[in-house]
């Protein structure tokens, strides 16, 4: 086997998704702990002196205890090279999450054992299902009072339309949660230890061993466990082809907080999840193991390091081998380039790398030439990877700098944050950038925008929410745009590409405007590839 094939086969690149507060970021930390990447896990919520989670690198994330931007973390464990893409769980940042899922070969779906399938779980699952990537389910918080495990499996199948296969089974729940039964190895794993910051000790016992009743403090509990396991055995078998197609989800139970069940989950997951998958381009499917390098940009982030004040473009390598200082071709820019400072990341920590392989994510310095969705290839191999989803904003805010002397910083900040895809900026026709209209999917994005403008660019903002919630592109106008008959429930805007749009206070206002302007044709901005 060639070195190229061997290296690519070692890669495991996956995203972790969940509804807010299901424990996604804590699980990410425990992957790093058991993978040997960190000596002690941070805790997202807890004592004030607990350090913040490794994956939450932005200052506002550390303060609020939530993830508002995707993090990329690479580490080596058990012969695998692991690339974790941690995503925001909050629905206001779903656009960043959707883009990140485009770079993943598999997904870990974290579910709260007490709450089951929640709204954001459904939305993110749909994106994974559209891509037909393997989806592994981790039922978290078994250390708390949870719903019946069989009911949870039924709900996943009913709500998400995917078959399930329990890879392990919980031994008790809440204060009685002591471990899991590993079905593949036919063993009971009892865990102990009170702090979730360190590895949990475990003891292996046979399911039918007489000491199990003693460990469970009840012969009745032992018999119930045996009955559950035997009931599972009468069900469907694990079909890896169905897993790879995204039709069957292996399910694991555990507690990210106490670490119970985390180590066997990570070990099994790395064996089951696929090596980097082939990608579709406009010329057909690109072979992952082709020696020719190719990649696409799925994320842009400014000011990850305050000392540098730079901007990184995150590239998912789709084929071949990347080498530092080699010559590559930027398809959208139509030019050759050398990427001399490629970096691999552990959240905000960076390290210059000489080479990387298909499946890896690298960050490259971006002087403003890259956009989300761009394709990079070797010279002579020109094609475009499928686009990245973009979303129509649902909330709009008029924004300007409180201090007019800060105009330059205001323009730079809004443009850079918009290029990251965190916000969309519009302006009134024939106006400058002194005042802009910011559009976002969720209002929490406005809080983050305001926080970053102050902290990263030194600009205090004047912000006025606007009564608009719908936006449409003008496809055809019956008259000059400034002569359109618009009421108080509509306003004409331009985007950064100079395209003309209308924003409306309601869906009914759209219909009213079209009827008042015969010949006006509007296009809906939907989740689209761009």
Regions picked out by a protein language model, each given a short descriptive name:
Residues 1-530:
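Structural and coupling elements of P-loop NTPases
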């Amino acid at each position: 086997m060639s070195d190229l094939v061997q290296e690519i086969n070692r890669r495991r690149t996956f995203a972790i998704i969940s509804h807010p507060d299901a424990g996604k970021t804590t699980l990410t930390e425990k992957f790093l702990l058991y993978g040997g990447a960190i000596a002690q896990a941070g805790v997202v919520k807890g004592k004030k002196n607990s350090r913040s989670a490794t994956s939450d690198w932005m200052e506002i994330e550390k303060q609020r205890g939530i993830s508002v931007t995707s993090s990329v973390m690479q580490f080596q464990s058990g012969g695998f090279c692991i690339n974790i893409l941690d995503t925001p769980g909050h629905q206001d940042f779903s656009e960043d999450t959707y883009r990140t899922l485009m770079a993943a070969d598999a997904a870990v779906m974290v579910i709260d054992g007490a709450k089951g399938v929640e709204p954001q779980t459904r939305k993110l699952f749909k994106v994974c299902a559209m891509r037909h990537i393997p989806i592994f389910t981790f039922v978290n918080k078994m250390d708390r009072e949870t719903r019946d495990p069989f009911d949870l499996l039924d709900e996943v199948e009913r709500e998400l339309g995917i078959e399930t296969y329990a890879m392990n089974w919980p031994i008790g729940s809440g204060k009685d949660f002591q471990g899991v039964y590993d079905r593949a190895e036919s063993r009971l794993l009892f865990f102990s230890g009170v702090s979730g910051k360190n590895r949990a000790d475990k003891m292996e016992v046979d399911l039918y061993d007489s000491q199990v009743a003693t460990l469970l403090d009840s012969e009745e509990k032992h018999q119930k466990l045996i009955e559950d396991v035997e009931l599972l055995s009468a069900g469907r078998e694990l079909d890896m082809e169905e897993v790879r197609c995204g039709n069957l989800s292996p399910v694991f139970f555990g507690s990210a907080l106490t670490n119970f069940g985390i180590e066997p989950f990570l070990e099994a997951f790395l064996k089951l999840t696929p090596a980097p998958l082939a990608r579709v381009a406009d010329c057909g499917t690109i072979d992952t193991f082709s020696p020719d390098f190719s990649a696409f940009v799925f994320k842009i982030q400014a000011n990850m390091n305050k000392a540098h004040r730079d901007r990184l473009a995150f590239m998912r390598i789709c084929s071949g081998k990347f080498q530092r200082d080699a010559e590559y071709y930027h398809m959208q820019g139509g030019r050759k380039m050398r990427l001399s400072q490629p970096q691999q990341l552990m959240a905000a920590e960076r390290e210059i790398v000489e080479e990387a392989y298909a499946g890896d994510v690298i960050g490259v310095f971006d002087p403003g030439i890259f956009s989300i969705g761009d394709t990079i290839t070797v010279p002579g191999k020109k094609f475009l990877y499928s686009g990245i989803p973009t979303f129509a904003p649902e909330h709009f805010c008029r924004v300007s700098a409180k201090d007019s002397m800060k105009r330059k910083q205001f323009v730079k900040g809004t443009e850079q944050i918009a290029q990251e895809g965190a916000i969309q900026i519009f302006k009134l026709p024939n106006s400058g950038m002194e005042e802009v209209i910011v559009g976002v999917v969720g209002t929490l994005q406005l809080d983050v925008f305001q926080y970053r403008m102050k902290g990263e660019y030194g600009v205090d903002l004047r912000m006025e929410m606007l009564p608009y919630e719908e936006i449409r592109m003008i496809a055809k106008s019956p008259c000059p745009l400034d002569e359109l008959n618009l009421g108080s429930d509509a306003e004409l805007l331009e985007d950064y590409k100079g395209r003309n749009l209308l924003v409306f206070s309601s869906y009914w206002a759209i219909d009213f405007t079209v009827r008042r302007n015969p010949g006006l044709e509007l296009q809906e901005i939907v989740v689209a590839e761009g």
